[in-house]
Amino acid sequence: IAFAVPTGTVKGFHMAAAHSDSPCFKVKEKPELTVEDHYMRLNTEKYGGMLMSTWFDRPLSVAGRVFVRANGEIVEKLVSVDRDLLVIPNVAIHMNRTANDGMKYMANVDTLPLLGGKESGGILPIVAKAAGVAESDILGSDLFLYCRGEGTLLGENEEYILSPKLDDLECACGCLEGLLNAKESENI
């Protein structure tokens, strides 16, 4: 919620609203899952209403916040691992011949992202390095997956915008731009 208070008497309200949450996968605490002693996946859960199929076979990473011990206090640090780190792989067609007949995804089984081999050190050391803190100082986290694909213009005349989470973020951006560029008035 953001607003500007006029300097004089308030005459009324001008409002704009947009949801700013973006459906994604939230990383659970202690998320590392070693599968069949071969590879490591992250335990995640769905956040918001989403089209799960759009998350498959794309470069993903992790961003959010960590809570760290610093000088006797608990402080929050924003963090983004700025590299292609994870993928939610589709099963090859020869392993699931009915994949093109429509899939029903189970988030707790089918959409767990692949992090690395069984010798992977897990996600916490990677997040700690990105945050510039010692792994032992991290007390908790609030981390989410995000798609690393960049937005682009497409179409014959570049008349279309293609970008992950566009429907959520453009609404929030439009409201913020409106607030920042509004002329001072007698309304909140």
Task: Please tell me what each predicted stretch does.
Residues 1-188:
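N-terminal hydrophobic/helix-forming segments and targeting peptides
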